[in-house]
Amino acid sequence: MEGGKGPRLRDFLSGSLATWALGLAGLVGEAEDSEGEEEEEEEEPPLWLEKRFLRLSDGALLLRVLGIIAPSSRGGPRMLRGLDGPAAWRVWNLNHLWGRLRDFYQEELQLLILSPPPDLQTLGFDPLSEEAVEQLEGVLRLLLGASVQCEHRELFIRHIQGLSLEVQSELAAAIQEVTQPGAGVVLALSGPDPGELAPAELEMLSRSLMGTLSKLARERDLGAQRLAELLLEREPLCLRPEAPSRAPAEGPSHHLALQLANAKAQLRRLRQELEEKAELLLDSQAEVQGLEAEIRRLRQEAQALSGQAKRAELYREEAEALRERAGRLPRLQEELRRCRERLQAAEAYKSQLEEERVLSGVLEASKALLEEQLEAARERCARLHETQRENLLLRTRLGEAHAELDSLRHQVDQLAEENVELELELQRSLEPPPGSPGEAPLAGAAPSLQDEVREAEAGRLRTLERENRELRGLLQVLQGQPGGQHPLLEAPREDPVLPVLEEAPQTPVAFDHSPQGLVQKARDGGPQALDLAPPALDSVLEASAECPQAPDSDPQEAESPLQAAAMDPQASDWSPQESGSPVETQESPEKAGRRSSLQSPASVAPPQGPGTKIQAPQLLGGETEGREAPQGELVPEAWGLRQEGPEHKPGPSEPSSVQLEEQEGPNQGLDLATGQAEAREHDQRLEGTVRDPAWQKPQQKSEGALEVQVWEGPIPGESLASGVAEQEALREEVAQLRRKAEALGDELEAQARKLEAQNTEAARLSKELAQARRAEAEAHREAEAQAWEQARLREAVEAAGQELESASQEREALVEALAAAGRERRQWEREGSRLRAQSEAAEERMQVLESEGRQHLEEAERERREKEALQAELEKAVVRGKELGDRLEHLQRELEQAALERQEFLREKESQHQRYQGLEQRLEAELQAAATSKEEALMELKTRALQLEEELFQLRQGPAGLGPKKRAEPQLVETQNVRLIEVERSNAMLVAEKAALQGQLQHLEGQLGSLQGRAQELLLQSQRAQEHSSRLQAEKSVLEIQGQELHRKLEVLEEEVRAARQSQEETRGQQQALLRDHKALAQLQRRQEAELEGLLVRHRDLKANMRALELAHRELQGRHEQLQAQRASVEAQEVALLAERERLMQDGHRQRGLEEELRRLQSEHDRAQMLLAELSRERGELQGERGELRGRLARLELERAQLEMQSQQLRESNQQLDLSACRLTTQCELLTQLRSAQEEENRQLLAEVQALSRENRELLERSLESRDHLHREQREYLDQLNALRREKQKLVEKIMDQYRVLEPVPLPRTKKGSWLADKVKRLMRPRREGGPPGGLRLGADGAGSTESLGGPPETELPEGREADGTGSPSPAPMRRAQSSLCLRDETLAGGQRRKLSSRFPVGRSSESFSPGDTPRQRFRQRHPGPLGAPVSHSKGPGVGWENSAETLQEHETDANREGPEVQEPEKRPLTPSLSQ
């Protein structure tokens, strides 16, 4: 697909017509292609667009759609495939489609298509062109207009309503263009009578007809011209293009007589219908009043019945809740057992979790240690390899620097020899004739020039030696740097290079002495000195310009990446020196005519060294040729030098050439300003050198000689002739020097390119270094990922331990939520029943409003009021729905609050458990403290005994010991007595303390028993809460299901109300249009009667013109048929050429793809080679690392032995954990005791359930007794309904009699009919289709209403005459289909009903619950009988469960059915004892 066709196809396929047409695939049986479309969407967008467009343009889908629109038109929906190819059957399908569509417009819709027929050849053989897209768009527009005017238009309108609003608006505009005759697309064949039209309207009609005829004539001319062109292409020798000689108008004038007759007939028919409708209006008003009174009475009765139905539903809900509670008991027991099992598993998981935590901690510590050692070894290896590479690079660069230095010295020697030769030639050329006064000054000038050359050479050698020393210092600094840095690859770390680069611009001062000295001589010596200065300048400049040739002599300089930037300051001096050239070249042409122009370049030249020497010969050439060449010739050369300059701009960090080229444009002005500032600084330096006495002596000599030469007088004619020849020779030499300068400039450019290549190589190396660092970082990240994986595993183990707690918390939260939701359940159901009643009332009211709107024209106001009331009720229902949503949100918030409360309860429970553990720990601590205190008391007693012994010993050695020995023995006895007394006292104190500690221990044991009792109570409470939560969860699920049903019903009601509102708007628009048409017809009748004669005359003229046009049309048609055959052959050749072109394009695409694949493979091959080199280098590194890792492995084995020791210690700790597990088993025994208590409670609940079942049987017997009363009332209601049906039948027969009398004259088209007659037929059909004998007639309660109309809902097509093709479509088939669907549902439900006993008549089953779907039956499906007992099927005095379920179902059916029916006002309400 070409580039221009893609957007056009995309716009067309995203438009409204294509969206509508492709969406009809599901209606015509092509929905199975959806999977293919999804596969196409996954392909490339152009191919997907082509496939979707070709699916539309092949005509198969459109023919199927047209088969639904016009099934009885010409031929069936036949599709021809496999003729000569896809293009041929595409042309055949589209031709067939166009013929059937044109016939449908002309025969069925009485419309003539004015738009030209589509170019079928373009659509068939070039379907992707813009012309084909436009032709297909026109066909789709006509198909859309036919779909909304056919018999099955409701089907297509529903499809259009299912699209987006934007697409609907666009489709509405397209439908308006196609369906309105005045839009220029179609023309009405049966219009009003020209005599009945006003003059203005008649003139407008005639103008539109003339415009249509002229358009048709233009299209005919275009078609004839195209046919002639095709004939010329087919047979260029036989046929010649013939211009259309005449252009008679061609149009549908032969239909004008038919239009006039149709208009008159329509006017008469409208008058007759107006009279009939006026009579019908009076009759229908009386009927409407009676029906309104009846409707009011029925509403009151329905309200009374709805209250009783609500009470019955409440009773039924209570019984269901009791049954569900009884059925949840086994499930609660099973949940309790599962919870206990999960508790045991949780304890086992906890112990395993602790073991895993300890083990993972040890593994993490060892892993961290190993990672640190590995990282240190990697860093050392990296530093070692980097330092080795840097040493090798520095050695190679040092050798290159020595080689460059030798080459530079050799070049300096050559330049000195060339300068001497040039000096000798200059002397010979400047020698005056013998005897002239100029010999003395020339003899004095030669030594000064030689001295200058030697001084320049010496300065150059000094600068080279200084640079050599600086390079050696830089090398030493680089060798002394640590291995972690990369001085060669990272430019910002090259700090030692910066002083060299800063000093580099100052070196050219030595080279500028000689030209500056000559300039100074020129300033002081006058014009004669200027004749001497140019040769000297040329010699010096030539010597300085040939110096840059040295770098080219060594072709191996490009091997080092940063050689030109860091190790060769000469290149850095040469490369940026062209930046100042624009200043010199701009000033030199301005002063080319004067001989003192040398002052401006010398004073303005920037201090950039050899750059000024390169540019000086050009300036000198400008002086010598200034009288002949214009100023404009030098300006391009200057600008060329300026453009070369910024490429070599110097800088301390040596930026790459790519950056300099990017900055070339905006930095030119800055280069000029900086060049001027540097020039001023350089002038100051040169003035300082000029003042040097070593330069002043030869200068004074030359000045004296020049002055003598100037003042001696004019030069003879021979000297002038020789001077002219010498000037020519000098010019030639200057030209040679200029060429040499250009060659040097080229060499500088080559060096610049080499520098760029070196910079790129350095960038590549830096990228490789970055890649290596990234690989290292990835290795670190992998290690971190492994650590994170271990942490994740630990978290997963912890989550497994916390899963039980979270599950229990969620279950408890659901319990609380469902408890809150259960309180609102009844309110929901009450609201739902009320909404259902309101929706049914709204349905009936809408149907009544629709029937009144279609039958009576003057009931528009009353319908509007009814509609407003309905909208108000709908808004109230929406508000109620919003309130229910708010309540639901409130319930959700309460659920969240209950969950929070449950969490708080769990936290309190945990805190109590922690408090219990704390008390145990406290008791143990107190016991330990008591033991320690007892030991301390014993120690104190021992210390006191020792003190007493010491005192006794001191007393024995005191003054008492000095007495007689007789006193020693009594004192010893006394001390022993005192000591015994103290020991007894201390023992008594210890006994008292022991008794106190035993009392505290008993008190703590009592507290422990109370805490255990509270823990048991909390466990019981948690179990009860779990039971309550499960019960509330079931209630919540029931409530959610009911809420969803209510929401769905509310949405259905809103959709129905929207559809009713839309139909009302349509009917109102039709009524207003009919009123306007009636008024317009009355006016047109008065106007057209006056102008009928003139129109008849014009009609005769138009008929004559029409005959002439028909003759011309027949001739053109014959020629068109001849040309069509020739065109088919030409188009077949075009198709073959197009296929060949597409094949060639595919070959070209395939060739380009292969070329791209080849380039990609080459790049991958290069990259693989580079990777192979890197891998070989890394392999050597890894071999070194392997030796280190072996040593580490030995160390790790030692650490492993240590870890095994630690694991032995952990096993001992696990034994302690086993002891704690034994304590947990005791707790499990307590839980088994609780289980036995729970089973006892379950047995009590079973007894209660049996009692409830007995009560339920009693309630069922009462309901059977109340059933007789209900059926007696039902018979009375049926009698009243029969009376109402008889009255309604009389009204229907009266309406039929009126329509038989007032039936209008049938139209000539037999396929159209009156939808009102069809409706009356359907009103009469229920009488013929009676119910079965001996029972209640099915659907009899709605026989006379509009709800009983319509056929089966599967066809969605009209019945009776419409099915045969002889009837007209009814304005409300959708409503009839819905009402018939309701009747069929009721009939099927009544047929599937089962009898309870023979004494109850057959009625309709409940629509709220299907058979086998009640809560009781679901309960019986889960449990075979009450509490496991078998189901009783007997019909004796003991009513079984199944019969009771049927009785309840029938009772629900009658309660729901008797709501909208008629009943007596005196009927008593149901007794409150009714329960289900």
Swiss-Prot record:
GO molecular function, one term: microtubule binding
Membrane topology of this protein: Peripheral membrane protein
Subcellular location: Membrane; Cytoplasm, Cytoskeleton, Microtubule organizing center; Endoplasmic reticulum; Golgi apparatus
Keyword Secreted appears in the UniProt entry: no
Gene3D superfamilies: Calponin-like domain (1.10.418.10)
Induction comment from the UniProt entry of this chain: By endoplasmic reticulum stress.
Residues covered by region (Disordered): 427-451, 509-706, 825-866, 1323-1476
UniProt-listed InterPro entries: CH_dom_sf, HOOK_N
Keyword presence, Cytoplasm: yes
Keywords (A to Z) from UniProt: Coiled coil, Cytoplasm, Cytoskeleton, Endoplasmic reticulum, Golgi apparatus, Membrane, Phosphoprotein, Stress response
Annotated Basic and acidic residues bias: 678-690, 825-834, 842-866, 1448-1469
GO biological process: cytoplasmic microtubule organization; cytoskeleton-dependent intracellular transport; defense response to protozoan; positive regulation of cytokine production; positive regulation of T cell activation; positive regulation of T cell proliferation
GO cellular component assignments: centrosome; cytoplasm; cytosol; endoplasmic reticulum; Golgi apparatus; membrane; nucleoplasm
Signal peptide start-end: none
Stretches of the chain forming a coiled coil according to its record: 253-481, 720-1303
Tissues where this protein is expressed: Expressed in endothelium (at protein level). Expressed in NK cells (at protein level).
Function: Acts as a positive regulator of T-cell maturation and inflammatory function. Required for several functions of T-cells, in both the CD4(+) and the CD8(+) compartments and this includes expression of cell surface markers of activation, proliferation, and cytokine production in response to specific or non-specific stimulation. Enhances NK cell cytotoxicity by positively regulating polarization of microtubule-organizing center (MTOC) to cytotoxic synapse, lytic granule transport along microtubules, and dynein-mediated clustering to MTOC.
PANTHER family tied to this protein: COILED-COIL DOMAIN-CONTAINING PROTEIN 88B (PTHR18947:SF35), HOOK PROTEINS (PTHR18947)
Similarity comment: Belongs to the CCDC88 family.
Name of this protein: Coiled-coil domain-containing protein 88B
Organism: Homo sapiens (Human)
Gene, per the UniProt record: CCDC88B
